[in-house]
Amino acid sequence: LKDLLRNDLSASELGLLKRSFDQIGSIAQLEIPDELKGREKIIARKVLDNFKNVETVVKKDSKTLGEYRIRSVKFLAGERTTETIHKENGIRLKLDLNKVFFTPRLSNERLRVLNTVKKGDVVADLFCGVGPYAVLIAKFSKCRKVVANDLNKDAYDYLVENVKLNKVGGGVEVFNKDAREFNIKADKLIMNIPKFSSSFLDVAFRNVKKNGRVYYYTFASSDELPLKIREIKANGKCRILSKTKCGDISPGVFRWCVDFKKL
């Protein structure tokens, strides 16, 4: 991105610009600092003109807000829409950036989780969003079923659509309710709600079988991670299987997935 704009922005302006952007379907999602607010249209037009599979350019307009983790976006250039179909790992996901939480940055992490699912497993994703884990696992694993839930009605509606879009209806049970209402016995349980995950640890231990595996996402610095692990162990007997760094959130703070087995 910086190379593209070398003739349009000053050296100090280029220094403020991030090197890359997220592409979600046909939408380019940029992070533009306030200092470059007056230059955002130039930046957006450059992206639109130079990336053939980009039809819309937006910028992140807020921090991730509320229990639904939605981060609003502002339209900058191209086709005026925030809805798109995102393709990753052999599946298609329809979504609206202003209505649901979605990040393409976890696509390799989702594959990692898929590769741990065994034949006959019951997999539960109680904060599933539009279904990136649930649909992927239903389509490419030999699990018995996937229980997919999200409290956000918009995310649930897209989840229902994505189950149909990927023809995995027979393998996914979809719900739109509070995760605390569940009492299932899953072999694999995905807890991808990093900001609030610690307040759902009791839900995780209740809904996973003995010897079942939990994928517990959290935000922490490397120094804070041992505290997060102590918090997990304080909620039930378990063994830590792995600690996977899934990208950075801010300087020194990372998204982690702590995989643990309930004992």
Features from the language model and the residues they span:
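SAM-dependent transferase fold signal centered on methyltransferase-like domains
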Residues: 1-263
